Structure formats: structure tokens, C-alpha cells
Design a protein with these regions (language model features):
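Clamp-loader machinery-focused feature within the broader ASCE/P-loop NTPase space
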Residues: 1-125
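Conserved adenine-binding aromatic site and its adjacent loop/helix in ATP-hydrolyzing domains
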Residues: 100, 132, 155, 159
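Loop/turn-to-beta-strand initiation segments
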Residues: 110-113, 139-143
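A short beta-strand-to-loop transition that corresponds to the Sensor-1 phosphate-sensing loop
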Residues: 118, 146-150
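Residues immediately C-terminal
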Residues: 121, 136, 152
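Conserved catalytic/switch belt of AAA+ P-loop NTPases
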Residues: 128-139
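Positively charged, low-complexity/disordered segments
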Residues: 228-230, 234-240
Length: 240
């Protein structure tokens, strides 16, 4: 689990989350939109940890209180990750894991937070079931949907959520992070960041992938090698 200061970029989003934690005024339903690997899940986890943090400090999550330690180990009883066993997230899974348990008050925290990654995988029936829950949630209930394809979600779902747009980071920021955390040569960090186009998750995978390095070298060779036509021209005798 990261603190807000350890998460790269997304400064405005982090400021909004920290204000919601500080003022104790989170929205009841969030929709985190952005491509896979851009940082949605990392910030969702940190946001949930900060909301549940028991520290008196303004710098939350503290990583030291009981709740933060539970978050670190994945055992915080009032932060629930909604999972699926099949390609889609069906109505029965949404009802069993979220809708039917929302009315049960938090066990030991101020909020009951549900995190739904890949929310675009929800069937229409599942979305309609969720809609009824987020239309009239209990005071302590918070749902955070994460998606890389917002158009797959019903307009009624979108309209009842606070949409948070996760945009690509600058190539320089991604390159610096990869260089520091992946311990790769400068040229490899630079190439990984360039090919990732601002997606930190992709850049990290590229930096650690031997297959990517080989493909990148092959592509660079194709661009730098002379074409057959150029080679033919180079062999032609120059005119007197």
C-alpha cells in the first residue's frame, strides 16, 4: 500500500482525495476512468486506506494504525474488493458481495467501502442491481468503480457517480520513476517510457520484459537500416 506522496502524478486527484479524507466528506459513489495500468487501483486502495485510517494525523493513511495494517495485509473487514469468477461480473455476484451486505454497518471503521475493478465487465443486470444500491446508499456506504471503458457502463450508473479521469503522465515523469525503481539502464528506461505513452504500469512491464527489449531493438533496427532502394542507390556509380 502506498501513501499519497509515494504515488507518481495525478496531483489534482490526490488533492481531492486528501480533502475528502480531511473534511470527512467523501462522495457515496466514484467512477475512476482511465486505461489499464494508469494508477486507478493504487489510488483507490490508498484512498480507501486514508478514509479508514485511525490516526489523528492529517497525513493519512499513516501505515501504522490497526486499520492501515489490515489494509496492508488485505484483511480490512470494511474494505471489500468485489471479484468475479467468469469473464463477466454477474448480477448474483454483485448482489452477494455488495448489494446484500451494504446495509450491514461497518465492523470497526467509519465507512464501508466497496472497490470494483474492471467495472466494465458488469452485465446490464448487475449494473441495474448496483444502481438501486447507489441511488439510496446508507450514510457510511462508498462504492468505487474502476474502468478502462466507461462507455460500457449504463448512463444511469455514470450519472450517479463522481467521475474521476486518470490521464497519462508525462514521459519524463514515467522515465524517472522506471529508472529509479526498475534499476535499468537509462536507454531502457527512456524506451520503456516512450513506448508506454504516459502509462506507468505499461512502462514498468516493458522495463522488466526481455521480449519487449528484443522487439524494441528490432523496431529500431528497421527504422535505422537503409531500405533496399537506398542500398541500390548507394551501389550505383556516380555520374561523371
Amino acid at each position: 500500500m502506498f501513501s499519497f506522496s509515494e504515488i507518481v502524478g495525478h496531483e489534482q486527484i490526490k488533492e481531492h482525495m486528501q480533502a475528502a479524507i480531511r473534511d470527512k466528506k467523501p462522495f457515496h459513489a466514484y467512477l475512476f476512468q482511465g486505461e489499464e495500468g494508469v494508477g486507478k487501483e493504487a489510488l483507490a486502495r490508498t484512498f480507501a486506506a486514508g478514509l479508514q485510517c485511525q490516526s489523528e494525523s492529517t497525513d493519512k493513511p499513516c501505515k501504522e494504525c490497526v486499520s492501515c495494517r489490515q489494509m496492508e495485509s488485505g484483511n480490512q473487514p470494511d474494505v471489500i474488493w468485489v471479484t468475479r469468477e467468469k469473464a463477466s461480473l454477474g448480477v448474483d455476484e454483485i448482489r452477494e458481495q455488495l448489494c446484500n451486505t451494504m446495509d450491514i454497518k461497518p465492523f470497526s471503521s467509519p465507512y464501508k467501502i466497496y472497490l470494483v475493478p474492471e467495472a466494465e465487465k458488469m452485465t446490464e443486470a448487475a449494473q441495474n442491481a448496483l444502481l438501486k444500491t447507489i441511488e439510496e446508499p446508507p450514510e457510511y456506504g462508498i462504492v468505487i468503480l474502476m474502468t478502462s471503458n466507461i462507455s460500457a457502463l449504463l448512463p444511469t450508473i455514470q450519472s450517479r457517480c463522481l467521475t474521476v479521469e486518470f490521464r497519462p503522465l508525462s514521459t519524463a515523469v514515467v522515465e524517472s520513476f522506471v529508472k529509479e525503481h526498475c534499476q535499468v539502464p537509462d536507454y531502457q528506461a527512456r524506451a520503456s517510457a516512450a513506448f508506454a505513452q504516459g502509462n506507468l504500469g505499461k512502462a514498468m512491464r516493458y522495463a522488466k520484459s526481455e521480449d519487449f527489449i528484443e522487439r524494441k531493438d528490432h523496431i529500431c533496427l528497421l527504422y535505422t537500416s537503409p531500405s533496399p532502394r537506398d542500398r541500390q542507390k548507394s551501389r550505383m556509380p556516380s555520374s561523371a
